[in-house]
């Protein structure tokens, strides 16, 4: 017989509790499933009921984004172009014509593109209206080139929050000396330093340049990798055979003037200079009348030759100059430096997505308008959005 007392509690099986829990769990899962089906049907019915409005809003949003992008990349002539007369809207070149109106330069002593950023870190200086129509009349193609170049820099400055100041190079009595006019670049730099006292860097660009990769910021493209990008000495590339070693040079000092070299020496079509006391002293030395008075009959390239002389002889200047590879901010079209046509260091590469192309010297035996058209079209092609292909295949 069992020794278990008759009045003791028998062990109770938990199967009933498990079954109840399983039913509840199954019910909750089914409830969640039914809720998901319900909300899906509700959403689908709402979308079906409002499909026209949703489609209209989506289309409007798409058009807004597309037009905003087109304003920067596909339309280089916006409000800067105004009609002058009925015969001013056609340019012809080798039998072809374009619809372009005479460009009216929006110059002022303080013409700048900064809008929301009143205290920009980087200021782009664009030299425009060279000669100012004083030395000779400017033709329609020159006005169009000027307008395209200005809009290219405006779009880039707006995109990255930089300031753009457009400097009118009209010949004036300030440069009454027959050779002094070519030194405007130095004087304009000094003026711009005073105009933007809180800026950190200034980027000078000649008019015949085109920013080919507007998505790249200067921080990303240059400043974040400056130590590995720039060359402090002339040992690797010295086209003018300047002295590559002079005493008292300290290459550990910070770089405050970033330039490039081409087949003719220092290239000042695109360069960067820092806002510092060193830079102000350099500009004062560079602007010294003794330089042009003593050497203006010898120096063919004027301010460029003066800078080369200062670099070669002044260790305090050499200590803070860095040389960027030419194609970093100054790539050339095939017609420039023709004697080095096979040297890839000089010429723009579409494959490598070079940042800036400089059509320097295009007015000496080359086609400035043809080159500007080509690189503008190429820039648009390389940077257009995927959806523009539906409209511009």
UniProtKB/Swiss-Prot annotation:
Lumenal side: 74-393
Gene Ontology biological-process annotations: cell budding; cell wall mannoprotein biosynthetic process; division septum assembly; protein N-linked glycosylation
UniProt keyword annotations, A-Z: Endoplasmic reticulum, Glycosyltransferase, Golgi apparatus, Membrane, Signal-anchor, Transferase, Transmembrane, Transmembrane helix
E.C. numbers: 2.4.1.-
Transmembrane portions of the chain: 53-73
The keyword Transmembrane helix is annotated on this UniProt entry: yes
Region (Disordered): 77-97
Full protein name: Probable alpha-1,6-mannosyltransferase MNN10
Natural source organism: Saccharomyces cerevisiae (strain ATCC 204508 / S288c) (Baker's yeast)
Record gene name: MNN10
